Amino acid sequence: MTNGYIGSYTKKNGKGIYRFELNENQSRIDLLETGFELEASTYLVRNNEVLYGINKEGEQCGVASLKIDDNGELHLLNKCLSSKAGTGCYVSISEDKRYLFEAVYGAGIIRMYELNTHTGEIIRLIQELAHDFPTGTHERQDHPHAHYINQTPDGKYVAVTDLGADRIVTYKFDDNGFEFYKESLFKDSDGTRHIEFHDNGKFAYVVHELSNTVSVAEYNDGKFEELERHLTIPENFDGDTKLAAVRLSHDQQFLYVSNRGHDSIAIFKVLDNGQHLELVTITESGGQFPRDFNIASSDDLLVCAHEQGDSVVTVFERNKETGKITLCDNTRVASEGVCVIF
């Protein structure tokens, strides 16, 4: 049995963090329950037996740390709610486990926290930095919108996507906070959202929410150079849709991207050691608004959460040879589910 967690909005029926048990032998979820009620826990990241989730209480915003016990159940360690500038949308941990990074979409800011490397508790907010970059012309690009922050494969920087400014910004970081390093621009109105790095550290898959495209970019010392781009929806689709999550299979052979509105998952074959993509197919996600999904470590199953509609959690069997996915379970619900991790 594999334990997984789903983060959620708590605007309507969402409860916070859901815990589920994935039965990989039967290709289904045997149990899905409220793991811990945590307001606005829209993104999660795990460090072994510690789980971090975005959180807010009233006007105070930040991150909570929770201990994962031997049964996969969650117990609160502590909270660091040191800001009133807005709730985050993405969190990640530095390789040395000393820092936690947070991106805040609404306010266009990034945060950096100090962690206790022994207990996993959050010690303090080190810095909150506002983006001030020229924005695109799309109606949703009225100001900067930091959407993702994570350490680069070389370990030297953090890369931050800005959906409002159509770019990736890299920063040096230390105990004092962030220091601007470089920026990489994409097309106007792309709405740069997330990054998935190939294991070789040379190539990155940059997804753009507003243009519904994925860029293959060469990464070198804090800079991203676009090599090619691909639509993640059919060319003739004219409905309202926006790209969401991106994940590589663990064997690095296939890339998956979800589309909210078209309600699908696009599957690409990874070629030439990561520098090219080729569309395999686009498969229905089995629900409404597939905000996030993840792939079990075995590479056999893909689990997808849906923010809207019935908020069904779909499980797909994955063909490792073709990359294609087949729906095999849609019996569980995680209201307002927007993040899936194992």
UniProtKB/Swiss-Prot annotation:
One of its GO terms (molecular function) is 6-phosphogluconolactonase activity. Belongs to the cycloisomerase 2 family. InterPro entries: Cycloisomerase_2, Lactonase_7-beta_prop, N2O_reductase_N, WD40/YVTN_repeat-like_dom_sf. GO terms for cellular component: cytosol. This is Uncharacterized protein SAOUHSC_02143.
